[in-house]
Curated annotation (Swiss-Prot):
Keywords: DNA-directed RNA polymerase, Magnesium, Metal-binding, Nucleotidyltransferase, Transcription, Transferase, Zinc. SMART domains: RPOLA_N. GO terms for cellular component: DNA-directed RNA polymerase complex. Mg(2+) binds at D460, D462, D464. Belongs to the RNA polymerase beta' chain family. Its EC number is 2.7.7.6. DNA-dependent RNA polymerase catalyzes the transcription of DNA into RNA using the four ribonucleoside triphosphates as substrates. This is DNA-directed RNA polymerase subunit beta'. The RNAP catalytic core consists of 2 alpha, 1 beta, 1 beta' and 1 omega subunit. When a sigma factor is associated with the core the holoenzyme is formed, which can initiate transcription. NCBIfam families: rpoC_TIGR. The gene is rpoC. Pfam families: RNA_pol_Rpb1_1 (PF04997), RNA_pol_Rpb1_2 (PF00623), RNA_pol_Rpb1_3 (PF04983), RNA_pol_Rpb1_4 (PF05000), RNA_pol_Rpb1_5 (PF04998). The lineage of its organism: Bacteria, Pseudomonadati, Pseudomonadota, Betaproteobacteria, Nitrosomonadales. It comes from Nitrosomonas europaea (strain ATCC 19718 / CIP 103999 / KCTC 2705 / NBRC 14298). Zn(2+) 1 binds at C70, C72, C85, C88. Zn(2+) 2 binds at C825, C899, C906, C909.
Amino acid sequence: MKALLDLFKQVTQKEEFDSIKIGLASPEKIRSWSYGEVKKPETINYRTFKPERDGLFCAKIFGPVKDYECLCGKYKRLKHRGVICEKCGVEVTLSRIRRERMGHIELASPVAHIWFLKSLPSRLGLVLDMTLRDIERVLYFEAYVVTDPGMTPLNRGQLLTEDDYLNKTEEFGDDFSAVMGAEGIRTLLSNMDIPLEIESLRLEIQTTGSETKIKKAAKRLKVLEAFNKSGMKPEWMILTVLPVLPPELRPLVPLDGGRFATSDLNDLYRRVINRNNRLKRLLELRAPEIIIRNEKRMLQESVDSLLDNGRRGKAMTGANKRPLKSLADMIKGKGGRFRQNLLGKRVDYSGRSVIVVGPQLKLHQCGLPKKMALELFKPFIFNKLETMGVASTIKAAKREVENESPIVWDILEEVIREHPVMLNRAPTLHRLGIQAFEPILVEGKAIQLHPLVCAAFNADFDGDQMAVHVPLSLEAQMECRTLMLSTNNVLSPANGDPIIVPSQDIVLGLYYMTRKKIGAQGEGMVFSDISEVVRAYENKVVELNAGIIVRIKERKKSRSHGEEPVEAITRYETTVGRALISEILPAGLPFSIINKVLKKKEISKLINASFRLCGLRETVIFADKLMYSGFSYATRGGISICLDDLVTPSQKNDIIHAAEQEVHEIANQYISGLVTQGERYNKVVDIWGRAGDQVAKAMMDQLSVEPVTDRETGQVRADKNGQVVTQESFNSIYMMADSGARGSAAQIRQLSGMRGLMAKPDGSIIETPITANFREGLNILQYFISTHGARKGLADTALKTANSGYLTRRLVDVTQDLVITEDDCDTDGGVIMKALVEGGDVIESLRERILGRVAATDIVNPETGAVIYAAGMLLDEDAVDEIETCGIDEVKVRTPLTCETRYGLCAKCYGRDLGRGMLVNVGEAVGVIAAQSIGEPGTQLTMRTFHIGGAASRTVVANQVESKSNGVIRYSHHIRYVKNAQNELIVISRSGEVYIQDENGRERERHKIPYGATLLVQDGEVIKAGQILASWEPHKRPIIAEYAGKVRFENVEEGVTVVRQIDEITGLATLVVIDPKRRNVAQSKGLRPLVKFLDENDNEINIPGSDQPVSITFHVGSIITVRDGQQVNIGEVLARIPQETSKTRDITGGLPRVAELFEARVPKDVGFLAEATGTVAFGKDTKGKQRLVITDLDGVAHEYLIPKDKHVTAHDGQVVNKGEVIVDGPIDPHDILRLQGVEALARYISNEVQDVYRLQGVRINDKHIEVIVRQMLRRVQIMNAGDSSFIPGEQVERAEVLTENEKLIAENKMPATYEYVLLGITKASLSTDSFISAASFQETTRVLTEASIMGKKDDLRGLKENVIVGRLIPAGTGLSFHNIRKKQRLSESAAYLDTDLTENEVTE
């Protein structure tokens, strides 16, 4: 019996470990793993199916094929356990050890490990300081390498060809040794003195001045340091013993018909063994050198193929010409070990089926088909049957269940009660894609799903399937109930808004209920309470939409939950439908909140208010009741669509006719040469775009109102003046769109307006629009034109899904180890939040931006000076309301960017957990949530890049800014301007802004003012809404004179640098600067047309404070508007640059833009930022580039070489600020980090990403983007190593530097200084400290090669590593589990040390 118990014990042993280390295996290590040498290539005997002795499946080496039975059958059964059979040499034990025991092959000649040879950069090359090409020549027997030069003039590591070698042998005899093949490389490696090499390299780095040498030396130094530190020997990169994988992991399976299916590894091993044995035989026979060489090369190639097939040369193929799957292929890629078996496992106790709607369910329930439940809950039923005594054994219980006897169904009901199950819909894009429900048994075979959770699952009922999973253990059930139950997931973790919002018919029903109809039956009746209204409605005395007056009893509640709700009775003018809804309103919500037409947005606000005021439980019940009402009244309303609902506007024909006239006119202008082809096309597209909008507007105007008809007479009602009385329309289509249930104005426009302009396959717009709509029907040409767009939509969707999924995967990978690990890191850092104002519109108010954040400094009331909220307070709805009423316009809040927690984040810097509505808990995996929140809406973004000239160019170019509110004008400190002769203020700064403050001094709007604009208001002037603040010429950019004087041209030569153009219409001649490339005279290529100013004595005017003359360069395409020798005043225009000449850039939009930002790619045609604050001057041009010099305040010059076709926004003598744009173009985020710091970078990425999502109407909290930026900035570059062990220029984790610096400061040594490095998400994922996580992401081979040389230790900090090694993840409940485990380990080790000490004392 004891033996039996021992047997069970064997299975359940569990190893406790805290980290995993990877390294190179020494030959001794490999032999110690092995249970014997594999000498023969045979696998199994094809007659007896028994493994051959000493072969690849040998039972003597790897263990018995059957449990407790040796191969020859002499020993069977448990009693012989552990005996080794003397006849066949097999140990009698479990056959399971054939999965664990390894063998080995003694190689007759050393072989290089291909990973360390070919995985770039080649590690062997770095260690030996040889090129990969040279090492390969030695390894593959094309050259000799000198291993010991002796007294000869040869160098160690020098390569000799065959002829060289023979000559040198004649010359020096055997004073030197040179070898071919891996032996030579191995000798070189084993003779290396690593500490000595490290010394000389460090010396070289300090003494040499060459950049490339330093870089190269640093790379070598890193590898050698790693070998030195890890205690591994470089010669282990050359294999002398090859380990053999346990046979069960490369199985050979007999198929029917006498054939065998085998793993490719067996083939690869067989080749290695065959070649190895042949080589041994040849060596014994003393075969000629050339034959042996060939055999050694073949051995090297076969080992290469086994380790990584296809890495070098042609891949080895099997019988069917397909490349064999090597060891490296087994672990990498989507089908490899990491992603297929470790990160994505299939689970037991699960099922899947089609979903159907279950409108009668409560929010926390789902319908589970009986058959499915029976199968899923089998073990529970067996157990119950046994305890009840219905079945004596499991077998009997099984029989009962299979016969489906009545008692089984009763037991199933009992087992299922209060046992939640998890439902999952693929693709699971965010955490709400798996939720727990209580199952209700249903007939049929489909799972029933509650309609309100569809939004979270993104499910519909057109044939979607869902999977069911059963949590087995009590802990799992508990977590399901407390964390995953659908009623606990009311808010979306992406933005904190409710995600359980009614949609479609529910919205339509509620909208219809709350609409008011003039002249409905029972209008104007007065009721004493709701129940009276219900009676009247049910007896058909009043209609649902009639306006009535009713007394309503309310229980009002304030947000601070201390006080009891107060009862009050108020009279309301309302409608019957709204009165009916007030019955289901939870106590504490005022009636006024539903006394309006309920559209989708209003319903969302309603549920949000309910959650904040009445708590979770009430809200869930309320949402359910809303749903039942919505369905019920949508049915009673009987809203449907018929053709007459599609009202085509009467003005349509006139509008189209007018547009056709305009187009005709422009065509005539084009023929007579007044407009260019491009202008004509743009204008035509503009005209039709406008016409389409006009038709749509006319249609909506007609659709949205209807005349009121009298119920009795059926006549249209008129007022005193004989005007027709109108009301909001009850047109079905209008109601659907207006309520937000389905459809939009754009779709209705196509149904009953005109379809409008269509795009060609290349994205350009076809200038003849479709004037018909779907109601009228399309003709053949119109139909053909529209097919392209429709198909492109489908193709786009498929691409989008894949791209979006890949983006999510990269985001998850970079943030997966970010968990809230402590309560407060006590930092005083944070970011200052203001309202986001663009133009005159507040895009995001201050309240939205700071809601759910923690204040970083005390928030003070500006009027009283009293502290309203202390630092460290979580700002909830009440707080942000008060901050807004106090007129505070900026607040410093904590942010994940400045959090000082080493591994992880602190709760205070993160703020509110958006999915739960309170301060985030320790253990929350905020990284993954951030990644999901950004990745999940990815499928809604567009895929394409817009070309200007497509739909984008329809927006009219702005030529002025006007205020939208009353207030006081304030100039920003960047703005610089001059006064011209007419006393107008002309702006001469590039990044100037004006903003408007209201009477409380709060910023209301902010406008960018371009260079050359005329300011029409003064700083501090009081203005009215609608006043024009500044105006400018939209299509031309001026160059403004900042000095007065006489103009002198230089290098302005007609026919050389400029040409005279006659304007066709006006007949005036102007000078236009031509492109240097088009100049015909060779020596004139370098000439730059410029202008200087002379004072009255004809001396050149200098830049104030310097001896440099003012010179202003005219750029290519400039139209010069002054004459040589003309007297000009300050603020006058010297030249104009037509805007059309600036190249139209493609605007990257949608998903590619988001990916580009997070990958931190340098955009093409990148703009330049000023490296320092200083004065601009132009230097000498080079070929094709112009040289721009900024001299800073200390007189240090910073040079730029800028391509000639780029537009430099700065000009000679202009003062620019550090980080200001000096060359137009998209900005490189790395520049922003370098010149403006972390905060500016985060702001830039945040705003840019948000712009993309905002365009699609997706709300994501800034917090999530900040979390990802934090991960992109987690590595730093060492600038000065101080007394640390870092190498200058090395990139390391920030946490590592901080820890090291703390130690150094404690010892009074020099800490290392560093700069932040911005890494793209892919790069950041690969450069993480955890090699397991990086290897499972991408580039598995490279990651593992590097890690093994470094002897890296993975501390299993992140989630991914722990999933891979099969432990609980260190997040949520797992975090506390790991912490408790660590504490226990510490106390155990402490106790262990104590006992040691006492024993020692005793012995003393």
